[in-house]
């Protein structure tokens, strides 16, 4: 058995930069995996990590991978959609079309018992059914995104325009994103270098804070920009 884990590549909106995977992309991934299953002569399982599924700013909906590939599993967390970071509550969905699904389901249950620290608390288990379909106020995220993206672009920064999630992926003002992040700390700006995600030269900024914080940060980002463009 081979298990192909596609997490940050196949969650959408992508947690790294907030872009959406289109249906055609999902179809291409599914087609490749089906061909490889035939080539290798056994199942390949696709694990799709989707904690940001509801955090989309348009009417566009992300296609479920289970509709395109039978041997797929979907991992979901309510911590993002309900803005409850750190709460260990979510689910793993095993496709009805998944081969050996009973064995896969049993393995998941066994892993949950073995790693007790990931078990859902008794407090949240009865609450979650009441939260299905509910999300945080996305209008706040959308407003923050627009203010931050437009503000940084006006200053001179280059950034990926996010279609979902709550992160802005910004090109660092020098090749070394880690060093750039250290310099930003001197201006009381906390940035996450993209090296941690396997891509160099960018930083990630979370905008799930108050709108006032976003507005107040722009003059500081401008000072940082001027430091690099003396």
Model-derived segments and spans:
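PLP-dependent class I/II
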Residues: 1-230
